[in-house]
Swiss-Prot record:
Encoding gene (name): panB
Species: Pyrobaculum calidifontis (strain DSM 21063 / JCM 11548 / VA1)
Keywords: Coenzyme A biosynthesis, Cytoplasm, Magnesium, Metal-binding, Transferase
E.C. number(s) listed in UniProt: 2.1.2.11
Source domain of life: Archaea
Record's subunit section: Homodecamer; pentamer of dimers.
Protein purpose: Catalyzes the reversible reaction in which hydroxymethyl group from 5,10-methylenetetrahydrofolate is transferred onto alpha-ketoisovalerate to form ketopantoate.
Main location as per UniProt: cytoplasm
Pathway recorded for this protein: Cofactor biosynthesis; coenzyme A biosynthesis
Protein name, entry field: 3-methyl-2-oxobutanoate hydroxymethyltransferase
GO molecular function, one term: 3-methyl-2-oxobutanoate hydroxymethyltransferase activity
Compartments, record wording: Cytoplasm
Cofactor stoichiometry and binding remark: Binds 1 Mg(2+) ion per subunit.
Length: 265
């Protein structure tokens, strides 16, 4: 029997009872594979700028980029919930611009969107959720603010920063977010956030106390050149690709490929 489609309700009901597993995907074949592996959610992340397009950060990723990759993932018709990152400067300018951007992502196949920020984007989250667009929040480290942060640094190490993260979490919940990504904060703070809100929290680099975890696919399978310290590599796909292509190159140069079973006389 076919498994049921994962929905927002699935995420909400998992709070405190079942760990949620999410991963990124950016195209049709990887979306199909990670879905077959049983993930609860697929994030079409603006991290594609770094792991697919070769940028130093996520800031150069455009809405057009995101729409194309969301559409590719959606064509796999995954059981998992498809969440799309809202790229830099598509929502910071206000609710109206955010709604236009979210509409394009939803039309492409996204089932929820994820802007970064806390109290400062409450008006955006309220507008989106009241208009029928599910929102997953993102607190702690916001990669789109890498320039002002001076790099990808842990957030919430001092008391003032901890209070800000907690304030952001509660504000986003009140604004209508159905879940929160909590990125690169101390595990004790992630635990405090998880206990303070009624919606599920999804950790990345924030310890084991959230309601779920998310990692970038390329970090998991060994395709990232410089994975973050909090990522775990479960396979070395890079070596498999290099070995397979090297064998192909050698056989072509030695005249061993193609053989009769690969062509018609």
């Amino acid at each position: 029997m076919e498994k049921r489609k994962v929905t927002i309700r699935h995420f909400l009901e998992a709070k405190g009872s079942r760990k949620l597993a999410m991963v990124t995907a950016y195209d049709y074949p990887t979306a199909r594979l990670v879905d077959e592996a049983g993930v609860d959610g697929i994030l079409v992340g603006d991290s594609l700028g770094m792991v697919v397009l070769g940028y130093e950060n996520t800031l150069r990723v455009t809405l057009r980029d995101m729409v194309a990759h969301v559409a590719a993932v959606a064509r796999a018709r995954p059981r998992a919930l498809v969440v799309a990152d809202m790229p830099f400067m598509t929502y910071e300018t206000g609710p109206r611009d955010a709604l236009r951007a979210a509409a394009k992502l939803v039309r492409a196949g996204a089932e929820a969107v994820k802007p970064e920020g806390g109290v400062e984007i409450v008006d955006v989250v309220e507008k989106l959720t009241k208009t029928g667009v599910p929102v997953m929040g993102h607190i702690g480290l916001n990669p789109q603010r890498v320039l002002t942060l001076g790099g990808f640094r842990m957030v919430g190490k001092d008391e003032e920063a901890r209070r800000k993260v907690l304030e952001d979490a509660k504000a986003l919940q009140e604004a209508g977010a159905f879940a929160l990504v909590v990125e690169f904060v101390p595990a004790s703070l992630a635990k405090e956030v998880t206990e303070a809100v009624k919606i599920p929290t999804i950790c990345i680099g924030a310890g084991p106390h959230c309601d779920g975890q998310i990692l970038v696919l390329h970090d998991i399978i060994g395709l990232s050149e410089k994975p973050p310290s909090f990522a775990k590599r479960y396979a070395d796909v890079a070596s498999i690709i290099r070995e397979a292509v090297a064998k192909y190159v050698a056989e072509v140069r030695e005249g061993k490929f193609p053989t009769p079973e690969h062509y018609r006389p």
